[in-house]
């Protein structure tokens, strides 16, 4: 039991550390699988990068907690399940809090301004023509 628990926590820790470091460096691109994936964060690349930069430090900390608790579960055979559960809950709580912070940061970014002007063929009366203002 303690070997499986240690491996699961170790893999979770490495994954959280990798996502956190990529987020901190701004190298995590929008995707469907990892990172802060709220509607506000997925609006554009810059907002996604900001949200994951904010969530990066908590994700790295959560990864460290998972790795340390996995190591403790391996070393302390009699308390492996207790150390593993406490570490898992702690790591997921820290990662979740980081995701909330990243989501809130993304929500504070104003919507990008859309260019004004004609959006297609619906401009009647020469509205899109350079001579329309004459």
Give names to the regions the model predicted.
Residues 67-72:
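Alpha-helical transmembrane segments of multipass membrane proteins
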Residues 1-9, 80-90:
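Hydrophobic alpha-helical transmembrane segments
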